Swiss-Prot record, chain A:
Keywords for the protein's UniProt record, in alphabetical order: Centromere, Chromosome, Coiled coil, Nucleus
Function: Probable component of a centromeric complex involved in assembly of kinetochore proteins, mitotic progression and chromosome segregation.
Family: Belongs to the CENP-O/MCM21 family.
Signal peptide limits: none
A Pfam family the protein falls into: CENP-O
Major subcellular location class: nucleus
Coiled-coil residue windows: 38-77
Superkingdom, taxonomy of origin: Eukaryota
The name this protein goes by in its record: Centromere protein O
Length: 303, 294
């Protein structure tokens, strides 16, 4: 009896449980589906909205581009410009702020820039060699109550104190301009030394700086004279601390034959007049063309 | 499966959002460029702000805030102008190309340095790698009125060729300063010795003439050139050119005329530019006290 009862209970109850689970799952599934559909609809709407926004922007850009074209045309014709249509006063002011901020940033590219501080000014001196911008140096200069440098990142071998003594009290602009010359020349010499180290070891070797100011530089390089390889030693002396080209280039070779000596004197003026890496590129390409022509001569000789 | 159905939209949304961001940036740039071309607009906007009512309170607050920002920037710029000697009047920066680790910008800049006006168009490349960021100028065009100054025009083309923008600014600044110094010096001597000093081409020219009022046939020309060398260093070079009639040269047995130029150079070394010219005027023009005191 008991057994039958339990069977009966299990049968009906489990069936009911199953039904309940089924309906629950169905409800969950339906709800999930509904949500997904809703999300899909929302995304669809968002896509449409974004597309509209994009097309509007595109149209606006086109309109401005046409305007710019028109201005260009009038500029060439030498006419006075009217006002750009459709730009509100607010927007104009915003653009004005943008332009002024751009100008402030632009000063960094000129070598001397800075920001006023409570006590004076924080100056940034940027350096460059040809088109490449190099290290920047900073100085915190107090102007009140008395003029003085409170902090700086100028390397110790730059005669900052001496320059400051000469100009800082009387002419801040002059002080910065003299300091700039020292720093820019130093950065330029250092840059050329770094470039020197990137040449292949088979061509340039033993590159060494003589001091931290980079005013003495020695290295060895290989050339071919009359199809024979020679190793030349170069010592470049940068006589002016505000210069980034050497004032003297001493090149030596153990061999004394005239053709080598001739090469030496031509290289010496090449080093004094050109950036170091440019001069070496020139020497190496000269060598290659010579090798090529001698190789082809060799070729014709064989056949 | 439903999830998969959602994906195309999500991808498109992401793409669209990215595109809109890029377009917004472009829009800002063309807006700036249009405004740059019609610079009158800035002034209009500023003028109308000062002269009229703005109905919307909120907007007024925004505008006031913007005006304050403009004022701040202008003060800061003025300060930088004094430090560097450079003044910018118009500037436009445009993105030419942008990727994750590098960007190319195109710049247009109009400005002046003392009385020298310049207009630049250049491109910069900013690249970022793991341990450092670098910036370089990859193209440089300089438009300047420098027909009268051959040294300057030579320097400008050299700088363009080597894309040395920084050197251009620094050398231009000291060149302009020397020009100003020369102009002031010439004008000061003209004022002090109106009869002896002549400025036939104006105070901004490269030379001034000296003559003795009692002997108008003889003239000395002080030529003051401002040289810019290969590395951008600015050096003043002064020369003395005597313009003496041949008859007078024939009488000059001891070679005074011939030695004048080297004598002047020695004088410069000892007394400096100002002192040398002063002494030259005193001795050559034999001025009576009346002229000197004018």
């Amino acid at each position: 009896m008991e057994q039958a009862q339990s069977l009966f209970r299990e049968g009906v109850l489990s069936h009911l449980e199953q039904l309940e689970a089924l309906s629950y799952n169905l409800a969950v599934k339906q709800e999930k589906q509904r949500q997904e559909w809703a999300a899909l609809r929302k995304n669809q709407e968002l896509v449409l909205e974004l597309r509209k926004k994009r097309d509007e922007l595109k149209a606006k850009i086109e309109r401005h581009k046409a305007e710019i074209q028109a201005f260009r045309g009038r500029e060439e014709a030498g006419e006075d410009h009217g006002s750009a249509a459709g730009t509100s006063q607010q927007a104009m002011l915003e653009l004005c702020v943008e332009e002024l901020k751009g100008m402030l940033e632009m000063h960094w590219l000129t070598g001397i820039s800075g920001k006023r501080t409570k006590k004076g000014v924080c100056v940034c001196i940027s350096t460059a060699f040809e088109g490449a911008y190099l290290d920047s140096f900073h100085l915190d200069i107090a102007l009140k109550p008395s003029v003085g440098i409170s902090r700086h990142s100028v390397p110790p071998f730059i005669p900052l104190e001496q320059i400051a003594k000469e100009h800082l009290q009387t002419d801040l602009k002059k002080f910065l301009s003299v300091l700039f010359e020292h720093l820019n020349a130093y950065a330029g010499r250092k840059y050329q030394f770094q470039q020197l180290q990137s040449f292949p070891g088979g061509f340039v070797r033993d590159a060494q700086q003589g001091n931290s100011l980079h005013t003495v530089l020695t290295f060895g390089y290989n050339v071919r004279v009359e199809k024979q390889p020679f190793c030349l030693r170069a010592k470049l002396l940068y006589g002016g601390v505000t210069r980034s080209l050497p004032t003297e280039a001493v090149i030596t070779c153990e061999d004394n034959r005239p053709s080598v000596q001739e090469k030496i004197s031509s290289h010496s003026s090449l080093f004094c007049q050109n950036p170091l890496h440019r001069a070496l590129e020139c020497i190496s390409s000269e060598d290659e063309t010579l090798n090529h022509s001698s190789a082809s001569l060799l070729g014709t000789h064989m056949f | 499966m439903q999830n998969e159905l959602n994906h195309p939209y999500e991808d498109e949304i992401a793409l669209l959002q990215e595109e809109i961001q890029e377009l917004t940036r472009q829009y800002k740039e063309v807006q700036t460029e249009a405004a740059f071309l019609s610079s009158a607009n800035f002034k209009q906007a500023l003028q109308s702000y000062h002269g009229i009512h703005i109905p919307d309170q909120e907007r007024m607050k925004d505008t006031a805030c913007l005006m304050a920002q403009i004022e701040d920037c202008k003060n800061e710029l003025q300060f930088l102008n004094n430090l560097s000697g450079l003044e910018f009047t118009k500037y436009l920066k445009k993105t030419e190309h942008k990727s994750d680790n590098q960007a190319i910008y195109k710049h247009r800049l109009v400005g002046q340095c003392q009385s020298l006006l310049f207009q630049l168009e250049f491109q910069t490349l900013e690249s970022k790698s793991r341990d450092n960021a670098s910036q370089s100028v990859i193209d440089l065009n300089i438009i300047m009125e420098c027909r009268e100054q051959s040294d300057l025009s030579k320097f400008v083309s050299r700088v363009e060729e080597r894309r040395n923008l920084l050197l251009f600014f620094r050398s231009l600044s000291s060149f302009a300063e020397w020009c100003e110094c020369r102009k002031n010096t010439f004008a000061k001597f003209k004022e002090k010795y109106p009869l002896a000093v002549g400025l036939p081409a104006g105070a901004s020219a490269e030379y001034m003439t000296l003559r003795n009022p009692q002997n108008p046939g003889c003239e000395l020309l002080i030529l003051w050139r401002i040289h810019i060398d290969d590395e951008g260093s600015v050096i003043p070079i002064l020369d003395l050119l005597p313009k003496i009639p041949e008859q007078a040269v024939a009488l000059d047995k001891s070679g005074v005329v011939e030695g004048a130029a080297s004598g002047f150079r020695n004088l410069l070394r000892v007394f400096g530019i100002h002192g040398s010219i002063e002494r030259l005027i005193q001795s050559f023009c034999c001025l009576s006290d009346t002229d000197a005191s004018v």
